[in-house]
Structures are given as structure tokens and as C-alpha cells.
Amino acid sequence: MKSTGGNEVQKAGKSQVKVGRQNKTIITNTMYTMGGMLLMNGVLQLVIYPLLNRQMGAEQLGNLLYIMGLVSILCPSVGQSLNTSRLVVRRDYPVTNGDYDWTILIFGVVGSAAALGCSGKELHTPSAYLATFLLLMITIFRYYGDVEYRLNLNYKRYFIYYLMISLGYLGGFFLYRASGSWFLIFLVGESLALLYVGISGTVFRGFFSRSASFSVVIHRGLFLTLSYLITNTTLNMDRLVLNRLMGNVAVTEYYVVSLIGKTMVLLIAPVNTIVISYLTKRRETLTKKQFLKGVAAGLGVSALFFLFCEIATPIFIRLFYGNLYESVKGLIMVTNLTQILGLLSAFLFILVLTFTDERWQLWLQAAHFVLLLVLAAAGTKAFGILGFAWASLAANCLRVGAVILLGVAKARKG
């Protein structure tokens, strides 16, 4: 009996050590992922874009932001969705690198052609069209490329991946100063990351080898890509609607006032990657109780992020875009709240994705997109940029409520 009791204590001790190590690993991985995103976005938002604002002015920067808006819509929609899809599908199908590499290539070419068609009057020369096409394709593969480190839970290399992008942006800026082409900033950054994953990883090896699961990858990936496409179009709705209805200066103004909030949204993305990486390794799905705990945690973190944004946004605008502060100060609170609710819904969607069919996410995203488009167009026409801000807030409130209801309805009992 004593021996049995001793064994039980020993097993309990080993179990606690194992849990402690796992928690430490999760914290370390979170630091690496958030550190990588902070570094990349810090270089962009604190160095590259403020310097471009001084070089170009609000009108030309608005043109650049519109083109980069197309990049921000298409590239994560294809690259990140297939990245996430691979983590989920691997549990049920023996997929290969080539299955996903081919899918990215097909979706990327079709999507890039569509994005060029949406560029309208913002691209003026054949070289600008070519540079935009190259930027779209390279960035799509870059968004997918970090799946190498998510599959293996190697978040130290994930950090280095984003370090390469940051260094590339800085190097590309010097090439921009010499050539006058801002495309070089982003082409160099994205290409350097792909070079790193090509050297350190295997995710692009066996590019042309497809398995019997290829059709599954196409089918599952298409639904998730469409869902991400709707989400990212929604996130960049300001650039599309304001560009069409008010012009490039309004695009720059809303970009500046929403920047801190959008950076918070970007920061939650790597946390989401860790969440889905660990949850998809489990055989059992979340219970209603576990999902609601996730909702509560998301609400708490979102409240803290909102307070931070309210303090940081005015300081940031005065420091880096002082010439625009007076024209945007009335937008700060409503815009920050809009972005933080977007952050919360993105986190909740990741939780829901682990125990529901991808089509549910697609339908909810589509409904939110249509609602936002209608409200934003009407609000902007009636009240200008302030009308757009309030319309966006209303749509995001409804989105958060809808995804919580879906999670409660679909999570297993317990």
C-alpha cells in the first residue's frame, strides 16, 4: 500500500512538472510570436510609414495605402487561410507540401488578377502593374511560409522569420530613396523572409508533388480563403470606401487614427496561431463551459487593449503625424473601440473554427461584410468620415454577438 501511494505521489509530481513545462513553453512561444509581429509592425508604423508621409504627403501616401490595402486583403486571405487550414486538415488527411503549394499558386494567380482589376486609377504604368502583381504573389507565399514553424511549434524561428521581414523593409527603404519606387521596400522585405524559410525549412520542398488529398485541400481551403477574404476586406473597408467616396486624404486620416487599434488586431494574430496550433493537437473539442471561459478571457484582454489604445493613439499621432492631429482627434474613441471589437471577434472565430465547419464562419463573415458595406456607404455619404467610423462600430458589435451565439450553439456539452 505504501508503495502504491508513493507511486501515485510520484506520478502526480511528474504530471505537475509536465504541465509546468508546457505552460512555460506556451508563454515562451507567445513572447516569440508577439515579439516578431511587434518588431515588424514597429518598423512599418514607427519608421517606414512616417518617413513616407514626410516624403510623399497625405495625398500620395493615401495612394500607397490603397494599393497596400489590396495586398492586406488578398495576401493573408490566401496565404494565412491555407496556413491555418493545413493545421486543421492534417488531423484527418495525409496532406503534402505540394498539395498546399499548388493551391496557393492557383488561388494566388486568380486573386492577384482580380486585385489588379480593382486597382482602378491608382496604378498608372505597366511597371506599376507588374510590381503590384509580384508584390501580391510574393506576399501570399510569405503569409503561408510561417506554417513551417507552426507545424513544428518552433516559434524561435518564427521570430527570426519576422526579423528578416523587418530588416528587409529597412534595406528596401534605402533602395526606395535611391530609385523612387516604394514597391522595393515591401518586395525586399517579403523576399528576404521567403529566402529564410527556404533555407531553414522544408515547407516549399516537393512543390510539384500532389497527393490523393489535393482535392480535399482545394475544397477546404476555398471555404476558408473566402471567409478570410471577407474578413480582410472588412478590415480594410476604410481604404476602399473612403478612397471611392472621399479621396486619398481621407484614407490617410482614417489610417492614422486607427493605426494603434489595428496594430493590436495584428498582435492577436500570432496568439491565435498558438491557440489553434495547440487546440488542433487535442482530439477532444471545446465544451460550452470552456468556450465561455475563452469569451470571458477575450473580453478582459480586449478591455485592457482598449484602454491602452485610448492613451497611446493621441500621443502617437502628435509624435508621428502632427499635421493631421486636429482633423482626426474626434475619431479616436469610436475608431479604437471598433478595432478592439474586431480583435475580439477574430479571437473568438479561431476558437469556434476548432469545433465547427468552415462554412459557418464563411456565412457569418459574409453577413457582417454586407452589413458593414451598406452602413459604411450610407454613413460616409451622409456624415463623411465620422459616419464611416460609427457605421463600422455598429457592424462590429453585431459581429461579436453573432460569433458568441454560434459558439454557444455548436460547442459540445460540458
Regions found by a protein language model. Give the residues of each.
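Helix-loop junctions and terminal segments of transmembrane helices
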Residues: 45, 49, 75-94, 262-285, ...
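Hydrophobic alpha-helical transmembrane segments
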Residues: 159-206, 371, 385-409
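Membrane-interface junctions at transmembrane-helix termini in multi-pass inner-membrane proteins
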Residues: 85-93, 139-160, 337-364
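Signature of the first transmembrane helix
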Residues: 2-5, 22-77, 222-249, 372-377, ...
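Membrane-water interface segments that mark the loop-to-transmembrane alpha-helix transition
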Residues: 28-41, 66-123, 284-308
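Transmembrane helical elements of multi-pass membrane transporters/channels
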Residues: 29-41, 45, 164-165, 182-197, ...
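N-terminal membrane topogenesis motif
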Residues: 1-43, 200, 208-224, 403-414
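Interfacial segments at transmembrane-helix termini and the short loops linking adjacent helices
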Residues: 58-61, 119-135, 311-343, 386
